Amino acid sequence: MFALLKLLFIYVTLGSIAGIIGIPYSFLKRDIGLLYQVAMWIVKTGVRMAGIRVEVSGLENVPVGRSCIFMSNHVSNLDPTVLMPAVPSRCSVLLKKELMSIPILGTAMRMAKFVPVERGGKRDAAQASVKAAAEALQSGLSIVVFPEGTRSRNGRLSTFKKGPFFLAQQTLAPIVPIALSGTQTMMHKGSMAISPGVARLRFLPAIESAQFANREETLRAVRTAIAEALPEEMQPVDC
């Protein structure tokens, strides 16, 4: 619990200061790049202070000079804070719509072109999210998404939602699969406690959705790539 309180203190304190100063500055400059870099530094600092070490491999697999869709498995609330600073380009994120209502943070996320997703929403809401994500890609940003849609209950890779793959086919952006492990033992689903440990991120070879006939085939290729790169105890039972 102490590690969680330390993490929250760093994020709330430094995040509020950065937001109060950085949001008006970014608005005047019409560029959120500096605020994004500061935010990633704050996230990395919080993770380190919580006793979490992040090991990253496979960055050579990330296409240079192209907007990508980074797709990772999802096992813990810690995943975004571990993953985002490791991505070697400025990214937008598909996230729960409710997070956009958080004071200061919500404003910063809107300025950063983060994409709200309405869980269990109607078809129109889903299409609006895909459109916003496509616009972010076209503007030169990459996208981070957890295609399972929610955290795995047992740490094993679960089924994928089709929405992110519709986005990939629509934009033809390369998909970079990411195998994430370690965070499932640091913060279990339903728990507020954080245990120190090592989080491992493995960036896998990019997958071009254009080489597949439909999004179902693309989905299977990405899911198989992630499954095969995960430790055996995290692999899905259907692979």
Describe each PLM feature range.
Residues 43, 114-119, 149-150:
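Short, basic, glycine/proline-bearing loop/turn elements
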Residues 56, 115-117, 209:
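Short acidic-hydrophobic, aromatic-tinged amphipathic segments that line or gate anion-handling sites
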Residues 50-57, 126-127, 183-185:
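Short gly/ser/thr-rich secondary-structure transition/capping motifs
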Residues 18-29, 33-36, 48-50, 64-122:
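Catalytic core of membrane glycerolipid acyltransferases/transacylases, capturing the structured
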Residues 1-33, 37, 60-63, 217-239:
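Membrane-interfacial terminal anchoring regions of lipid-handling membrane enzymes
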Residues 5, 127-239:
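Non-catalytic C-terminal accessory region of glycerolipid acyltransferases
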Residues 38-46:
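N-terminal nucleotide/polyanion-binding subdomain common to many enzyme families
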